[in-house]
Amino acid sequence: MTLTASPTAARTPAEEKARFEGNKLAKRLARETTRAIADYNMIEAGDKVMVCLSGGKDSYALLDILLSLQKRAPFAFEIIAVNLDQKQPGFPPEILPDYLRALGVPFHIETQDTYSIVTRVIPEGKTMCSLCSRLRRGILYRVASELGATKIALGHHRDDILGTFFLNLFYGGKAKGMPPKLVSDDGRHTVIRPLVYVPESDLIAYAQFKQFPIIPCNLCGSQENLKRKEVGRMIQEWDRKHPGRSWNVFNALSRVVPSHLMDRDLFDFVGLKPTGVADAGGDTAFDQIDPEPDTAGPGCASDAPAGQADGMAEQRVVFR
């Protein structure tokens, strides 16, 4: 009788541990993505989801997770991966098609030489990202219409949401972030961000575990957005020195109290008058300025935002 060694027996303890941690991470990412999809009704029965694949870690992870969830979703929906080849110098045109064929997922490669347009318009050494992003967005909206996609899925994660919020706060004077779901300016497309609850550190680890064929994001040679980089460093520093702080700021984006801010469009301060009816949460005129304690730590993203816990079981989409 011939004995065959099992695959598990061939692994070293270090490899077995890495595999265990990777599988645990995959389950956590699937859980957080499912929660975001359910909380914001991102994907519905019959949807055709266009996953925008750039070749970076975030979009690879998004496609991988959605394909996994599609197999056990309680309803049917389609996925099509789309990459925009902008003719950046050195871009390897074969990597994504080969990867997607191996996955067996429907895909479309859209080739548009936006690189030449951007380099012609933007002076050398200046940041090209803003114009490039606008051109890319318009092309992807057109492709979504041509493909009959009902949802456009982007790979922005928790740190992107926080970074955009702080950029608008510090440099734009606005409390404005990056929503998990929006309708495009022309009113024709729904854009979703299923990784909204996922920190970037998890996506870095997941890319290493899955060995995605990452395509560098600096092929265009554009100057990196220094303000965004600075904000990113600030968030990373918080995570090191003050665990839980960045999660508390993130949670605050879904715990807005308009009556305790200053936006007259959100709350009628001008018409505010006594009603004779007690408001337990309304009188803070003589309170201390100390914030309410929040005992949630780095894992508080797994808790439903305040006010949404009741009845959540009835609304939640369950992927078995």
UniProtKB/Swiss-Prot annotation:
It catalyses: cytidine(32) in tRNA + S-sulfanyl-L-cysteinyl-[cysteine desulfurase] + AH2 + ATP = 2-thiocytidine(32) in tRNA + L-cysteinyl-[cysteine desulfurase] + A + AMP + diphosphate + H(+). GO terms for biological process: tRNA thio-modification. A motif (PP-loop motif) lies at residues 54-59. One of its GO terms (cellular component) is cytoplasm. InterPro entries: Rossmann-like_a/b/a_fold, TilS/TtcA_N, tRNA_Cyd_32_2_STrfase. Transmembrane segments: none annotated. The keyword Glycoprotein does not apply. It is found in: Cytoplasm. It is an enzyme of class 2 (transferase). Homodimer. Catalyzes the ATP-dependent 2-thiolation of cytidine in position 32 of tRNA, to form 2-thiocytidine (s(2)C32). The sulfur atoms are provided by the cysteine/cysteine desulfurase (IscS) system. This is tRNA-cytidine(32) 2-sulfurtransferase. It comes from Bordetella pertussis (strain Tohama I / ATCC BAA-589 / NCTC 13251).
